[in-house]
Amino acid sequence: GQQKERQQVVDELNKKQKQLTASLNKQRKIYAHLNARIDKLIQEEIAAAERRRKAEAERRRKAELARQRKLRQQREQAAARRKQTASSSKNKSSRKGKNNYDAEETATPDFTASHDVDRALSGSFAANRGRLPMPITGSYAITTHFGQYNVPGLRGVQLDNKGINITGRPGAQARSVFRGEVTAIFAYSGMYNIIVRHGSYMTVYCNLASTSVRRGQEVSARQVLGSVAKDASGNCTLHFQLRKETTKLNPESWLAR
């Protein structure tokens, strides 16, 4: 009788192990696809930023050439006017020509270059390392840390977390950790996911039930992005990632506690 009971316990444990493994494999597959989508969108954003940088450099080059050309023409015109009127009003023409020349020489193209804005934003984001607000409203607990971790209940099985999981209270909302631009909003596995660009830094907010921003929108620090959905266990859990271009960073060293 005892042997039969022991066998039943073993069978039950094996059954639970198989269920846990199946659930884990499903979760692993979902996260692999999600991260592949995030990687692709971030690569596209990096490529777009590089195109903008090159286009701005070309615009500046052309504007500088045009400025120099105009300045050269004005110098030539001023010299011609001085020569023409030298006999009648030499001093007056010289002053006028010099004034025109000086005014044009100090005039430079007026640019609001997004590349310069990106660089400034990247610098200010980096300067706030360790001081960024938590990306979730209300009280919270970090339930899964960055990097590899052992799966509870499965001996020797590890998963690799590209960010951190933050569990909050029911009704918790995701919020931007810094000012930036919403560059992507996409749905995956029934949940919304948002990418916000802060210069060369990107923050990713996953597992949202709804969103309250749109693509291309400028957001401020602590601005609500959407409501956090419940995970498989019924908890409101936000998956949060931080990247510097393609490099994955540990968010915990950047967030204030």
Give, region by region, the residue ranges found by the protein language model.
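Short aromatic-glycine-enriched beta-strand elements
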Residues: P152-K162, S189-I195, C236-L238
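Conserved, short, structured surface segments that act as functional micro-motifs
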Residues: I194-R197, R215-R257
